[in-house]
Amino acid sequence: MPHDTEFELFRDSYRRFLKEQVAPYYEQWEHDGLIPRDLWLRLGENGFLCVDVPEEYGGYGAPVHYSLMLVQETAQAGFASLAVAIGGQSELVSPYLQNIGSEEQKHYWLPKMVTGEVVTAIAMTEANAGSDLQAIRTQAILENDHYRVNGSKTFISNGLHADLIVLVAKTDPQAKAKGISILLVDAALDGVKKGRSLQKIGLHAQDTAELFFDDVCVPATQRLGEEGQGFAYLMQELPRERLSISMMALGSILGAIVITKDYVLERKAFGQPLSQMQNTRFVLANAQIKAKAAQAFVDQCAALYQQHQLSVTQVAALKCFITDVQCEVIDQLLQLFGGYGYMQEYPISRFFVDARVQKIYGGTNEIMKEIVARELLGK
């Protein structure tokens, strides 16, 4: 990605924000299982949310790589829960509104997302519908000037804090892909209920929740795009999500290398620093080599995205490759810590548990391989 002086100044500013506003409190947030709501306002005040939103909708009109950098830097600092939260707002929901929303919707929601006044979540997954989105059961039936919504969603990132829910629902239960639409649901509407915070093996500070919709009346004006085109919109916007996940993976790899390097330079075994042992050197060299390859792949796809040329297959290959590398490299680096790597007080343990879900959300890596194979084999 291009790095000019303005970009570097923006990145340095964000690094200072992480050091001053996040690092001293992150352990407590992980313990509490929730990032505080006021952090969103501080992110907004400092210009770190939805930075690529055009100025006419309250944003800064920055290039996309500014926004992606924020996700990478957050993950690299070891704050993966926050990276997922920011990514959900800036890399998932914001592009949907920018690219599909009506002028009224964009003018109403986007400025509040930029300031952090509104936190957003996208609700696709259900208990019986993960990779197979066509199997969702949540229904939104049109009645005069509103949709009546009934159903439930699970594994929803930012679910507890969400003020706006981008809901994927069946508007035609008899149809398959063409029966899916997307609604903008104000979380304050009657019938919207937020369930428990789900307990995960990683990403402890990232609020992940169940959402329930009981006869929720959503104005028809809050449908996003055309009725029945929801599945097509999802396919259209998924590349940005997968690119964001890949940026997070890259950041995690780079961050894990740094803390491991620092550890092996200090730690001694058998009378010498771990850094002098061949296995240690080879593990770190292998991690660095794979990080360089991952960086090149990410940069290529990010450049293609900015040129509106990134294909579904290309970003599927990237997401699969780099998250596999992330999990593999961090596992090998943790081994260099010995028993200390298994202790929560050592940051490498958090990098390890936070990495595992990267191969699952945003489309499982098995689905990514199927996408690549379909293009390769022609079916």
Please name every model-derived segment.
Residues 91-100:
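Helix-loop "lid/cap" segments that line or gate small-molecule binding pockets
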Residues 1-80, 87, 100-105, 112-117, ...:
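Alpha-helical interface subdomain recognition
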Residues 47, 70-75, 169, 185-190, ...:
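Short Ser/Thr-interspersed hydrophobic loop/turn segments at strand-loop and sheet-helix junctions
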Residues 146, 150-194:
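A short core secondary-structure module
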Residues 211-233:
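Long, acidic (Asp/Glu-rich), low-complexity accessory segments flanking structured domains
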